[in-house]
Amino acid sequence: MSSVSHSKQMGRPRDGRADRAILDATLRLIARRGISELRIDDVAERAHVGKATIYRRYRSKDELVAAAVTSLVSDISIPDTGSTEGDLRELMRGAVRVYRGSVEAGVMPGLVDAMSRDPKLARAVREGFLRRRRAALAAVLQRGVERGDLRHDLDFELALDVLGGPLFYRLLITGGPIDNQLADGVAELILRGFAASGARRRSK
């Protein structure tokens, strides 16, 4: 095979700037208009790319939306401070920094509504955004178990729900403040509610 034909098969490398522009444009349009009004034409215009550039990356609007929402996860670092308390506080403070942003806060209500109406979209978001995020959070909890700070029979699914629940309840339902006080309170709730027996005795 010639080097020319080989290079054609390989194709041009993806442009990371275009990737980011497409996802940012998608998030901003969702926040402004909702998912039902999201159009690929508008994403292309806002991102300054052609529609073909988008369709080479995402086969459908659902795939694009799921990828855009999943990109929010990459903005929340998974800390390793050396202590379970430090990890949980930094983890929740990172989530607070992301979800009190105007774009991120604007995306979630429309996303939840769209997921309730569109099983295909719901599945795409759960398999991308939620599964990836929960796996990263579970790694932090697992370190807490291994350090002896969290109980050895920890119910990971329940603990993960407790980590995310208060933030999204305020974001979607009550409109309460999403701040470091909330972040620290959730971390403390995990540390006390799921503490190993020895850790509970040491904290008294």
Question: Can you say where each PLM-predicted feature lies in the sequence?
Answer:
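C-terminal peripheral helix-coil segments that are non-catalytic and often amphipathic
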Residues: M1-K8, E90, R131, A135, ...
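Short hydrophobic/aromatic patch on the recognition helix
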Residues: H48-Y58
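Tryptophan-centric aromatic hotspots in well-structured domains and transmembrane helices
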Residues: R57-Y58, V125, F129, F168-Y169
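Hydrophobic alpha-helical connector segments
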Residues: I76-M108
